[in-house]
UniProtKB/Swiss-Prot annotation:
InterPro entries: PRC_barrel-like_sf, PRC_RimM, RimM, RimM_N, RimM_N_sf, Transl_B-barrel_sf. One of its GO terms (cellular component) is ribosome. Binds ribosomal protein uS19. This is Ribosome maturation factor RimM. It comes from the Bacteria. One of its GO terms (molecular function) is ribosome binding. Belongs to the RimM family. PANTHER family: RIBOSOME MATURATION FACTOR RIMM. Pfam families: PRC_RimM, RimM. It is found in: Cytoplasm. Residues 102-190 form the PRC barrel domain.
Amino acid sequence: MSERTLPDDLVELGRVASAYGVKGWIKVQPHSAQADVLRAAKQWWLAATPKSAPRVYAVQQCRVHGATAVAQLEGIADRDQAEALRGATVWVSRALFPAAAEDEYYWIDLVGCAFYSSVSGSDVRVGVVEEVFDNPAHAILRVVCQDAEGKALLDAKGRAREMLVPFVSAHIQAVDIAARRIDSDWPLED
């Protein structure tokens, strides 16, 4: 364990579920089905509570174990030390993520992108991607609808209007992470 400057691009990727074995390994429940980022990162930041500052740990070894990842962290040498980390959130710097394959995206990169629809042949800015979540078939974008000034459009009950859009090639025409833009042919809702 060491003290380093806290990166400003930390992304929460999982939670320590328990100790694993007697040699200080921990078992991490990832927030997504893929533990590739956890396995590839050589540094993790762990936060014991939501209000505590994360502390950096060097990852000595990590491997996928079913739906979890198990890891050995520098400075954690026995089961008691590993058990003390139970419940801690696991964070990784976005800069340490491996490059995504072509036409694949990290969900964290999609959040905040402007969402456009081109149903009638012209691009219309619908809103901003607020969240990405999974269903059994594919990922879903939750888009908060906005006016031309970027203010949320409200429904009859005063709540922000939203659209749920399947993140599939049949409806998503282009994704430009650098420009923070997603183009689609998803129909506009009235």
